[in-house]
């Protein structure tokens, strides 16, 4: 397990974006080899998405051979509703990059058979070869996707009733009107995310500090679903200073002492422009008789 500690939200977002960029480029995706990326919604990943868009616009990164799978979607909210996760992903990420729409996968909260929709989502992930890198965020209570306190740590994609705390927290997106807030959602399970080859969790802000403490310094507990990722062989937690406020000083010092090593994951920062130059140079073989 790696814990990446940066001073500010913007730095944490940039580190995460650089990591995604390097992972995609090093994977060397192509028509017969897609990079599969799990993605979250919410305010936490916005900074990361903005940097990824910047990399694409600068010609350093392409999503042409990337398939994405989103974590969750509300039940009963029209797809074009401004607060649907379809709208969120399109407006904040997908429409700004070169990803093909058919390679983006988001659960349909208006499907006639919701559980069949969840089962089909799991099948699509398997058909794509599994998730190479699943990026997630958490709530103050440590929930990932809509796997709220008490969720099974081996759960799969399913229909979930939302906790009142989540409904209250989401009311700000619906004009403060609780009657407008969806009470159910479709969500990947903890087990679904655990099946990914690698997991990166973004945790920023003092209001997430206790959840990070539970994830790092205490044991695995279904009341704090983020703690399950202690048992994943390749977990990267990326946080800002504010999110570490509940951690022991020696814990923070220990992981900061590893930053020289961990920063090698994003330095050097790879670019598809450089790869194209290398390809063209290798294609120009010197004359020999």
Swiss-Prot record:
Record's function text: Catalyzes the reversible conversion of alpha-D-glucosamine 6-phosphate (GlcN-6P) into beta-D-fructose 6-phosphate (Fru-6P) and ammonium ion, a regulatory reaction step in de novo uridine diphosphate-N-acetyl-alpha-D-glucosamine (UDP-GlcNAc) biosynthesis via hexosamine pathway. Deamination is coupled to aldo-keto isomerization mediating the metabolic flux from UDP-GlcNAc toward Fru-6P. At high ammonium level can drive amination and isomerization of Fru-6P toward hexosamines and UDP-GlcNAc synthesis.
Residue positions where Phosphothreonine is found in the record: 161
Cellular component terms per the entry's GO annotation: cytoplasm
Subunit structure: Homohexamer.
GO molecular function: glucosamine-6-phosphate deaminase activity; isomerase activity
SUPFAM superfamilies documented for this protein: NagB/RpiA/CoA transferase-like (SSF100950)
Keywords: Carbohydrate metabolism, Cytoplasm, Hydrolase, Isomerase, Phosphoprotein
Tissue: Widely expressed. Detected in brain, liver, kidney, muscle, ovary, testis, spermatids and spermatozoa. In spermatids, located close to the developing acrosome vesicle. In spermatozoa, found close to the acrosomal region.
Pathway: Nucleotide-sugar biosynthesis; UDP-N-acetyl-alpha-D-glucosamine biosynthesis; alpha-D-glucosamine 6-phosphate from D-fructose 6-phosphate: step 1/1
Location within or outside the cell: Cytoplasm
Disulfide bonds: none
Lineage of origin: Eukaryota, Metazoa, Chordata, Craniata, Vertebrata
EC number(s) on file: 3.5.99.6
Pfam families xref list: Glucosamine_iso
Catalytic activity: alpha-D-glucosamine 6-phosphate + H2O = beta-D-fructose 6-phosphate + NH4(+)
Family: Belongs to the glucosamine/galactosamine-6-phosphate isomerase family.
Native source species: Mus musculus (Mouse)
Activity regulation field: Allosterically activated by N-acetylglucosamine-6-phosphate (GlcNAc6P).
Recorded superkingdom: Eukaryota
Gene name in the database record: Gnpda1
Gene Ontology terms: biological process: acrosome reaction; fructose 6-phosphate metabolic process; fructose biosynthetic process; generation of precursor metabolites and energy; glucosamine catabolic process; glucosamine metabolic process; N-acetylglucosamine metabolic process; UDP-N-acetylglucosamine biosynthetic process
Stored HAMAP family: GlcN6P_deamin
Active-site residues (renumbered): 72, 141, 143, 148
Name listed for the protein in its UniProt record: Glucosamine-6-phosphate deaminase 1
